[in-house]
Amino acid sequence: NILELLNIKWEYKGGKLSFKPDISDFSEFNNITINTMICPANESNVKGRAQSICIELVDNKGKSEKVEISKESNLINYPKGKLENLDFENGKEIKFWNQVTPISNIRIPMVLYNDIDLKNIKKCNIIFDRTNSGDLLFESIMVD
């Protein structure tokens, strides 16, 4: 099976990806669940170090609150393995990671967003303000 993933790369601290959620009332949900993984073959991820990002919610009055997915929690881990090359006779080369890279299932409790109106969320931001660069693959972001 082929898994479709959204690849997000950043090259400076402070980048942001904004999107409008499919629903606006988050008040009946317990968590924001993110399924993501580091793209280890990209040098923008520091070898051996976990990544850290923030998830920000913005309500319809423009009030916002962000929660960090901390590198100390090791939720977005740098996987074991190494980058290898496969050389072909025609001169072409393929670089690949030699180990399976697991997807991290990260849950952010909705109670951490206590200073905004969870019944009226108009925007979600993924903020890349904790590391200077990185490359993540996202499978899903949802409320549950």
Report each predicted region and the residues it spans.
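Beta-rich carbohydrate-recognition modules and glycan-binding surfaces
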Residues: 1-144
